[in-house]
Amino acid sequence: MSSHTPEIAPSAVSSLISSKLHPTPNTALTLEILHNLEHQHQWTALKVHEPFSLSAEQAIPLISGTPPQVVYTHPDEQAYLLEHHIRPEDVPIDREWVIPTSQGEKWTLRRLAGIHDSLPKRTEDLQLGSFDLEQASKDMQEYIRLKKEKPWGGKRALLAMVNSGLGGDGTVVYYVTMEGTPKPRQN
């Protein structure tokens, strides 16, 4: 009787992480979240921004990319869309920023503000891509103009938190973080 144990192939995430020469914990965490965004949530145009590549405040890697649908709509923007009968699925999708973190990692307002300070202005994240502005309705053209001039809300990013306890289970939870505070809605 042979006691041959079949070899278990490494997961796609493990293979991605081990493809780096000397992966640091931050690199491994960032790649795990990048893999989750690409394969679980179908984000495109993903890019890792190495520490300090955006500013001196950016001490950790950040991820940017395009989600398949709008992640967050500011209450004032939502009111504008409703008032002008613009369907949310017709709105161009902004590039979004992701802050990789693990469960239990210590965060302060100063650290989070430093990350937000390193992000580009929201007007730079508007991606029109294949959107044909000339064919759009007047309301949609006005919406795009307003969004380019002064976007609703300040800078924002998704805080991607990985469950790292006991080796983790691959779960990633995303929290929307924003610069400043949105004003309360008026009913």
Task: Name each model-derived stretch.
Residues 5-155, 165-166:
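Acidic, polar low-complexity intrinsically disordered regions
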